[in-house]
């Protein structure tokens, strides 16, 4: 759905980030290199500049004219991309969580004296088990995620199947699949599906069952 948010949680190495990247490549037709630009990797020392963007350096050095007398903001790819991934979200400091809260809650960001309404996006976040490097997520921040799905490790039979896979498939250009699929069109179709009051209650029940 438009502005859909989902958190994937589970053990280390369970494929949460890989799944998020593959889905982005499929639905937004992004290359391996471009999908990496859409990822914000959680870290306790993340600054506002690393999350949102920075002032135009060319303007600061006088090599480019100001925009109506003001310095322009060069927004990071994470901010402007249609597909966003926050990797290891529980490594974000409370400060970083507050910066991202307006993005998730209102679809807008602000840096320096400029703000921007973020284009429609889909956001996935990954959550690993607690350790010494993790930070507790605030309740308002967690509440901005519509769904939280557990990602379990493969069982023995699944590991055996994975081990037998043709290694040449690792070089597949995932972005070339589903070429006829347009994410915005799918979201519009979903938005216009009619449903009864009973169906809405059932959907809300399912969503409530998959929240942190």
Residue ranges and their predicted role:
Residues 7-10, 82-83, 127-130, 149, ...:
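Short hinge/gating elements
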Residues 166-212:
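Basic, amphipathic alpha-helical bundle interface domains used for macromolecular binding and assembly
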Residues 66-69, 73, 112-115, 212:
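Short helix/loop segment immediately N-terminal to the Walker
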Residues 43-79:
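Short glycine-rich substrate-engagement loop in P-loop NTPases that contacts/grips substrate
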Residues 2-43:
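Walker A/P-loop
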Residues 6, 18-21, 27-30, 58-64, ...:
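Canonical AAA+ ATPase core
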